[in-house]
Amino acid sequence: MPAVSKGDGMRGLAVFISDIRNCKSKEAEIKRINKELANIRSKFKGDKALDGYSKKKYVCKLLFIFLLGHDIDFGHMEAVNLLSSNRYTEKQIGYLFISVLVNSNSELIRLINNAIKNDLASRNPTFMGLALHCIASVGSREMAEAFAGEIPKVLVAGDTMDSVKQSAALCLLRLYRTSPDLVPMGDWTSRVVHLLNDQHLGVVTAATSLITTLAQKNPEEFKTSVSLAVSRLSRIVTSASTDLQDYTYYFVPAPWLSVKLLRLLQCYPPPDPAVRGRLTECLETILNKAQEPPKSKKVQHSNAKNAVLFEAISLIIHHDSEPNLLVRACNQLGQFLQHRETNLRYLALESMCTLASSEFSHEAVKTHIETVINALKTERDVSVRQRAVDLLYAMCDRSNAPQIVAEMLSYLETADYSIREEIVLKVAILAEKYAVDYTWYVDTILNLIRIAGDYVSEEVWYRVIQIVINRDDVQGYAAKTVFEALQAPACHENLVKVGGYILGEFGNLIAGDPRSSPLIQFHLLHSKFHLCSVPTRALLLSTYIKFVNLFPEVKPTIQDVLRSDSQLRNADVELQQRAVEYLRLSTVASTDILATVLEEMPPFPERESSILAKLKKKKGPSTVTDLEDTKRDRSVDVNGGPEPAPASTSAVSTPSPSADLLGLGAAPPAPAGPPPSSGGSGLLVDVFSDSASVVAPLAPGSEDNFARFVCKNNGVLFENQLLQIGLKSEFRQNLGRMFIFYGNKTSTQFLNFTPTLICSDDLQPNLNLQTKPVDPTVEGGAQVQQVVNIECVSDFTEAPVLNIQFRYGGTFQNVSVQLPITLNKFFQPTEMASQDFFQRWKQLSNPQQEVQNIFKAKHPMDTEVTKAKIIGFGSALLEEVDPNPANFVGAGIIHTKTTQIGCLLRLEPNLQAQMYRLTLRTSKEAVSQRLCELLSAQF
């Protein structure tokens, strides 16, 4: 609503608004409005032609009445007439009315479009701005059809004023978001990119927003924006530059533009080393400025400064390729963890969750564990405590799992009810994933049920039963522990379920102790029977019949219970049926038949943890960019152990229906993939067969990404505007398992999605790869997983190629990347004393056993990063072995199916010359050569 001014005020409008405000009741307001509507209608229909001022005044009144919630069914034509006025205030009110009241189905839409086109063609910047604002405000598909071809011309025209360019860029962005198919790409795209060099802050800021959105679906059209964006960012953040210094906001130059440029650069990893180096300098400068004392105490200064810093950290995390920057970002975020500003603490915790998934920064994140635990205990804001829980979950590994699980259990007792179930799932996952001693796992889950039994879902207690059944070494301890837990006066029903199942299977393992004799076990369980729900009672009845088989001495007691009226005449059909059938079975079946029917449950088949699946579902639909679980200690081993399963093509036997008395086939089987071809050789997928379709050459940047995975196992292998490929892998001796995640970054389905692993003739005999097919349809925004089992038969020098073919929007897509399965993945670290090391070093002194490489450092020579890379390479890092403390010494064994190959390495850095000398000695020349090539490329 325009302000009332003396020069162009509408006194009648001001009086009408005052009258409405002074109304004492709803009826009085309606009466006054109806009176005014009658007056306006008579003026519009009168014989006397109204001047522009009167039309404007009456249209404003109609607009005000509409905003009060009353329908307006006239005055539209008068508003359209105002669009033809040459007076700004009249045209402004006309556009305001059109933007608010006229819909796309109006009969006047043709007249409105003509008026907008006339204003766009007028070259009057004020009128052009009004027209563009109207198009953006309406933003309908009809508007896009009418003007999507016109606005780019206005945007790139040489004589368009800066204010109009800014409006045109934002208007085009609005139309593209509502109707992307109606905005044609063309010659104008290259000219829009050059707006990144514009000297007007509004133009370059609007253009950056537009380019960022357009580039996400049209990457090829806008790839030239990378160098321009880096150059502009460099000029802004470098203090020596004067670029946009007039737009300094509280001592921070162009902060919002910097944020948008950093966000644009997340779309494209810089392919050119020079551009990448300049971007790294920019990011280092931003991190350095964050360490400087504030130039102002005002909150606006810190807000602007931190906005740029957090966006820079997001870019560093997204690229995940600069160890130094990642560690520095982590240290900077660590300072924010104790900041007095709650929002900064929240953002720091959120960003560190992502940093924890990087191989390079995981250890740096772990150094802040005490601060995060303290935040969990002392934070007042529940959302910050939630982020602290997320960060503890993300930073957890085998070294700190007991501490983190204990802290999360402690917090669970006082946690907000809204997040308890999620914490329960995370504790259950961590306890299983990092359990070295499975007695600790059993204790943790039982403690979890005790503290938060109402929030322990079926998936959690199903899972503990699966693991106990699959691991012989923990069965006796589990039976003893649940027996002791059930002796508490008040037990949660989930504990009764777990106790009933485990004692029914393994109660015999503790029956030799008089304190847990069969009869005592039965009476303990039966004392809980009448307090439980029907499903739990059904489970306990199944436990009783198992006791009949395990302990013949309690058979009469159990038969009396089954024979009682409360069971045989139970109102619940399921309980009645079980009682009748179990009683009959215990009466007529011989001992051998009873033992066969009620035999111990076989191990559960291997599959993804249903708890992990439930947590993913609870966190919402998985986004492609959120590889939250891509963490250092790989995936959960579904049979409860840390060892990867050996590659095998044999089917896993599943329990028969008769044996699954308690219905504990907990997680539904994964959806079956396409059936194997009839000509197949028995493998689920013939990964070595020649595909009829043409395999694409390696994608740009594939070799760089491949090199990044030599010293790490998790991360994003490939990413373009359509597809993201993430990896999680684990290796033990000559076996490995790799989880490949294919993420659809678009809103459109991928059809005929077919990933294929290709091995060369030289590689095929030395490396066995076996996998299963994936669903040929990948929904928009969804992610599918593929598991590859790996066996190293003999040493090798090449890497397999992953080829992905699919259809997107009717277009065939073909992508090939190298899969980072390298010889060092089968490296097992070996600790050696100094004397043993040099003795072995001398034994490997033949010329063919040693390979040496002297090379220039490609990255900053940082001691901690070097140590992390050597350890990530697979070697043990031997301390105090080399007489020169600046040198690095390592040892390990390459495991293959046919042999084991010992390996010793020595890395000598020369800081002054910025050079390295790497020496490797193994018993096999080809192995020495390959390991030297792989490790040299990391420095």
Swiss-Prot record:
Gene Ontology CC terms: AP-2 adaptor complex; clathrin-coated endocytic vesicle; clathrin-coated endocytic vesicle membrane; cytoplasmic side of plasma membrane; cytoplasmic vesicle; cytosol; endocytic vesicle membrane; endolysosome membrane
Q: Name one Pfam family in it.
A: Alpha_adaptin_C
A single GO BP annotation from the record? vesicle-mediated transport
Q: Could you say which residues bind a 1,2-diacyl-sn-glycero-3-phospho-(1D-myo-inositol-3,4,5-trisphosphate) here? A: 11-12, 43, 53, 57-61
Record bears the keyword Cell cycle: no
Q: Which GO molecular-function terms appear in the entry?
A: clathrin adaptor activity; disordered domain specific binding; lipid binding; protein kinase binding
- Keyword check for Membrane: yes
UniProt keywords, alphabetically? Cell membrane, Coated pit, Endocytosis, Lipid-binding, Membrane, Protein transport, Transport
Organism domain of life: Eukaryota
Tissue expression, as annotated, is: Expressed in the brain (at protein level).
Provide ranges: composition bias, Low complexity. 646-667
* Localization terms from the record: Cell membrane; Membrane, Coated pit
Residue segments, region Disordered: 612-681
Compositionally biased region (Pro residues): 668-677
Xref: SUPFAM superfamilies: ARM repeat, Clathrin adaptor appendage domain, Subdomain of clathrin and coatomer appendage domain
Stated membrane topology is: Peripheral membrane protein
List the InterPro entries.
Adaptor_Complx_Large_Subunit, AP2_complex_asu, ARM-like, ARM-type_fold, Clathrin/coatomer_adapt-like_N, Clathrin_a-adaptin_app_sub_C, Clathrin_a/b/g-adaptin_app_Ig, Clathrin_app_Ig-like_sf
Quaternary structure? Answer: Adaptor protein complex 2 (AP-2) is a heterotetramer composed of two large adaptins (alpha-type subunit AP2A1 or AP2A2 and beta-type subunit AP2B1), a medium adaptin (mu-type subunit AP2M1) and a small adaptin (sigma-type subunit AP2S1). Binds EPN1, EPS15, AMPH, SNAP91 and BIN1. Interacts with HIP1. Interacts with DGKD. Interacts with DENND1A, DENND1B and DENND1C. Interacts with FCHO1 and DAB2. Interacts with ATAT1; this interaction is required for efficient alpha-tubulin acetylation by ATAT1. Interacts with KIAA1107.
Q: Which family does it belong to?
A: Belongs to the adaptor complexes large subunit family.
Q: What is the name attached to this protein's record?
A: AP-2 complex subunit alpha-2
What is the organism of origin for this protein? Homo sapiens (Human)
